[in-house]
Amino acid sequence: MAYKSILVHADLSRHAPQRIAIAARLAHAHQAHLIGAAMTGVSRFYVENNRGMRGGAVAAQISALHGQAEQALDQFETLARQAGAFSLERRLIEDDEDGGMAVSARYSDLTVLSQHDDSEALPGAMSDLVPYVMLNAARPVLIVPRSGQFAHVDNAVVVAWDGSMEATRAIGYALPLLRAARLVVLALLHPPAGHAQPARHPGADIATYLSRHGVPVEVRPAVATDDIGAALLAMAAEVHANLLVMGGYGHARFREILLGGVTETVLRQMTLPVLMAH
């Protein structure tokens, strides 16, 4: 596959500039159309304030919500052009963050979000944004950590491989980045319960598949531990990786988010950008 359309969350968070810059550099490198999406949160505002506010107060609040979204899109446009994106689109969405980003992500090849930051409580910010989009969009999500600076995400890459459908999808979605990488390390994990064991040497088939796509890999067993998420992050640090690719495990019912242990660990403790697909 190729990235032809990249979506990035535009808001007024202190993490927005780095998120937008990474998305714009990827759009430039892959000659992709870049969409900045800002949510007004008007739908949630109506639900939470459907009684007790007079018409004038409602209109003023809605105007303020629109103003904040437009300000976020102004920042997106400025930063994206500075980073070299050549095809830009501003998208103002009358919805909350979770629903607005999940629906828009379905029509993009890659969505760029930031890791949740408990220390920054913006009005309308959703703590479950990343897992919600990952579990409801049927598209890959690139998550940028809340700490650190990341100039590149396609130099050295660690790929978590356990033979699962989620890991297979993540690799397929990451191919444009893997082809550009200097180093790709395949971290072998034990297959999830209920999955068939590989007939050949673990990792041989997926390594062959990747080599046919022009991606030579170095196969390594992950450290034997109960904390696989921490082991993956440790391996990424060891090889100086700037991207981790992995399947996102979890279940989404209504607005309840149920995540697998490895996914939850990585989303909470990530130290480098992570591409996840469910």
Named regions from a protein language model:
Residues 20, 25-29, 100-149, 235-278:
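Gly/Ser-rich helix-loop-strand patches that form or flank binding pockets
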Residues 36, 89-92, 143, 186, ...:
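A structural preference for short, hydrophobic beta-strand core positions in alpha/beta folds
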Residues 56-71:
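A short acidic, glycine-rich active-site loop
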